[in-house]
Curated annotation (Swiss-Prot):
Record has S-adenosyl-L-methionine as a keyword: no
Transmembrane domains' residue ranges: 20-40
Annotated metabolic or biological route of this protein: Lipid metabolism; fatty acid biosynthesis
Additional observations: Present with 41900 molecules/cell in log phase SD medium.
HAMAP family from the UniProt entry: 3_ketoreductase
Single GO cellular component term: endoplasmic reticulum membrane
Gene: IFA38
Species assigned in the record: Saccharomyces cerevisiae (strain ATCC 204508 / S288c)
A Pfam cross-reference name: adh_short
Name listed for the protein in its UniProt record: Very-long-chain 3-oxoacyl-CoA reductase
UniProt cross-references to Gene3D superfamilies, sorted A to Z: NAD(P)-binding Rossmann-like Domain
Subunit structure: Interacts with the fatty acid elongation system components ELO3 and TSC13.
Length: 347
């Protein structure tokens, strides 16, 4: 091979390497650009865009919002803030006395109509769903909030999970949510169709998701799976109902002070129900921390930033995140078992 041929061959190799470097550079620029755009969208959604106007969902026009799990925590706060926006309410929960007290509070303060239904969804009886159907039959419903949910009493290995607890979680989080939506969503479609000719009213279905569904959660395996299921179901429903002018959103939350989380004091990362619901209702239709997900929102700012960081670094399905999650819930389990042992000794 002559010297000139060697130079030509080296030039060809250099062009290949140079081309490869340009491809890598281009991919890097694309990644940085999309990351920057998602971060800007996060900031706009959380802090800069104005609050959503619920007039488009029929606020102050006699329309109804149905809420499950409405007697405590997040559900109770949804009822208060939707009543404040001028919606009549259908409140579905387990405890009659709590529902009656909330009914009186909201009717006195906001002068709205509040209908209540006390049923135990964990029983999964056909009569429960018939009662819901009868109550909602003649009501112009435009909003449904699927809030009812159940978790484990304490973190527990899947192989040690009691069958009753497992069945309750699936029944409440999945079966009941789907069946209630099948009952109420047609009413929303009907109401929106009638109103669209006059005012362009839209419908809205909100379903409570969880970080437990976003990130696989060892020691809460059944709960984690049930919430992950809701992600796929809610996104699919959003695609089906978009043609009917109904917005369907999954709401992702980290910890919130409530009886289910067993956390009493709020903090930077853990809002109270009032703070969480306020951030949710002001951001309906915006992704906030769920920039990579369709028809999904993580509305509370600290939760949103936390999700953004995990998603853009390790990834929600990575081994390291799974391991950290396992260690976190293992420590909670150990503390809970020690507390239970101390209580037994006192007795």
């Amino acid at each position: 091979m002559t010297f000139m041929q060697q130079l030509q061959e080296a030039g060809e190799r250099f062009r290949c390497i140079n081309g490869l470097l340009w491809v890598v550079f281009g991919l890097g620029v694309l990644k940085c650009t999309t990351l920057s755009l998602r971060f800007l969208a996060l900031i706009f959604d959380l802090f800069l865009l104005p609050a959503v106007n619920f007039d488009k969902y029929g606020a102050k026009t006699g329309k109804y919002c149905a809420i499950t799990g409405a007697s405590d925590g997040i559900g109770k706060e949804f009822a208060r803030q939707m009543a404040k926006r001028g919606f009549n309410l259908v409140l579905i929960s387990r405890t009659q006395s709590k529902l009656e007290a909330l009914q009186k509070e909201l009717e006195d303060q906001h002068h709205v109509v509040v209908k209540i239904l006390a049923i135990d969804i964990a029983e999964d009886k056909e009569s429960n769903y018939e009662s819901i159907k009868e109550l909602c039959a003649q009501l112009p419903i435009t909003v449904l909030v699927n809030n009812v949910g159940q978790s484990h009493s304490i973190p527990v290995p899947f192989l040690e999970t009691e069958e009753k607890e497992l069945r309750n979680i699936i029944t409440i989080n999945n079966t009941a949510t789907l069946l209630i939506t099948q009952i109420i969503a047609p009413k929303i479609v009907e109401t929106v169709k009638a109103e669209n000719k006059k005012s362009g009213t839209r419908g809205l279905i909100l379903t409570m998701g969880s970080f437990g569904g976003l990130i696989p959660t060892p020691l809460l395996a059944t709960y984690s799976g049930s919430k992950s299921f809701l992600q796929g179901w809610s996104n699919s429903l959003a695609g089906e109902l978009s043609k009917d002018a109904i917005d369907v959103e999954l709401i992702i939350s980290y910890l919130v002070t409530s009886s289910m989380s067993k956390i009493r004091r709020s903090s930077l990362m853990i809002p109270n129900p009032q703070q969480f619901v306020k951030s949710t209702l002001r951001s309906v239709g915006r992704r906030c921390g769920s920039q990579e997900r369709y028809a999904t929102m993580t509305p509370y700012w600290a939760h949103a930033v936390y999700q953004f960081v995990i998603t853009e670094t390790f990834g929600v399905y990575s081994k390291i995140v799974n391991s950290i999650n396992y260690s976190f819930h293992k420590s909670i389990r150990i503390r809970a078992l020690k507390k239970a042992a101390r209580q037994v000794k006192k007795e």
